[in-house]
């Protein structure tokens, strides 16, 4: 087992932080966006097998958010097929639900976004070993990926499962569910596209509930939504969901439709 993750050391200087956009200036509004000044690429140790698998497969199945001004993705070229729905999962973690859901929606392109490299390495391993052909991965902050890498009305769905609740009041400004992010997601969704959010944190659920109608382009559909055009059953209990259930937390889910 390797004790170091040399790949990051070769490509990113010490203290490197992902590019951070001034969203209010970028979009010309005064909406609320996460303030993530302390966020950086999280380091972690990969096993030798994970490193070998990463080196062999990441150039094909993965992309890194960089300092380049424009990294727009050609989804059809990346997946090698045209005319298929595309769903973005923000904060895929170790990819447990991603890998479980993908085979059930093989006609849908799934793009998993995560900062933590060992989490992406686990998902990459599951994708390669399971011969899952409809998953691609991006290493970067989800809001920046939406801004820099995805054109308007390019997505059929966005999933945000168990985002960091940032429970301390002084950290609430870091929560991803904010008025500005909902506006950004709405702009990237096609009409009829679906936003699905799940949390096990009661205070965060209340926070989100106060925002369900804040974005005029999104129609809140509640939960469950029997006629939802996309898969909403996560199939497995994710790591963070399991921790919440162990503490008797209630899972609260939200669904919106792009008008």
Swiss-Prot record:
Keyword set includes Transferase: yes
GO molecular function: tRNA (guanine(46)-N7)-methyltransferase activity
List of residues binding S-adenosyl-L-methionine: 89, 114, 141, 164
Record-linked PROSITE patterns: SAM_MT_TRMB (PS51625)
EC number: 2.1.1.33
Record GO cellular component, one term: tRNA methyltransferase complex
Enzyme class, first EC level, given as a word: transferase
Pathway(s): tRNA modification; N(7)-methylguanine-tRNA biosynthesis
Catalysed reaction equations from the record: guanosine(46) in tRNA + S-adenosyl-L-methionine = N(7)-methylguanosine(46) in tRNA + S-adenosyl-L-homocysteine
Biased composition (Basic and acidic residues): 1-11
Protein family: Belongs to the class I-like SAM-binding methyltransferase superfamily. TrmB family.
Name of this chain's protein: tRNA (guanine-N(7)-)-methyltransferase
The species this protein was found in: Corynebacterium diphtheriae (strain ATCC 700971 / NCTC 13129 / Biotype gravis)
This protein's encoding gene: trmB
